[in-house]
Amino acid sequence: MFANYSPFYDRAGIAIYHADCLAVLPFFPSESIDCVITDPPYLVNYRGRWDAKLQAIAGDGESSWVQPAFAEIYRVLKENAFCISFYGWPHADIFVGTWKSIGFRPVSHLAFIRRQWGLGRYSRSRHETAFLLAKGHPPLPKQAIADVIEWDGEPEKFHPNQKPLDSIYPLLKCFVPESGVVLDPFMGSGSTLRAAKDFGLRAVGIEIEENYCRIAVNRLAQDILFS
């Protein structure tokens, strides 16, 4: 899809690059992406001790990548467009400070409520959060999205931070223009790309772990949900 870098997968408007996003994004043309939906490492040094199938998350132990990665994300995103990024609340200051410093404007905050409770020392987590970030002044959506979205767990989990497709669908519907291109530079197991395929959108994913690239390809091979 982009010159000088061979995709791991490229079919029917969906491309996957097996690489660090900082190695691939410089090859993307400026202002070539209509919307970014991503779930980057939370900087909490995650270890999946409770499930041997789920690996540690690359880049989760340090923050040096945050500024250069989001600077590239900002560059490739079109003017007057949105980036929706999940983040880890223990280091919200790093994420929010970085986003503002490179030009993003936080315009809304979204909470995703799980039916199942997580673990915790002081409180048991039941939600995850994302910022809606604007580059420039995007047009208002035809119908504003609710800032609290409930989700069920996925029937099969491939990644420790995997987001259900039902959490991605309303974001695509509200913030991605028709026939737009969606970017997920921290693709994981490919939920953003799978959801984009269901909506008939073009999408690009970047993932540093080859195993997750293969999982995403397998998920893309399944029948589309909508027709």
Identify the meaning behind each predicted range.
Residues 1-214:
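Core catalytic lobe of class I
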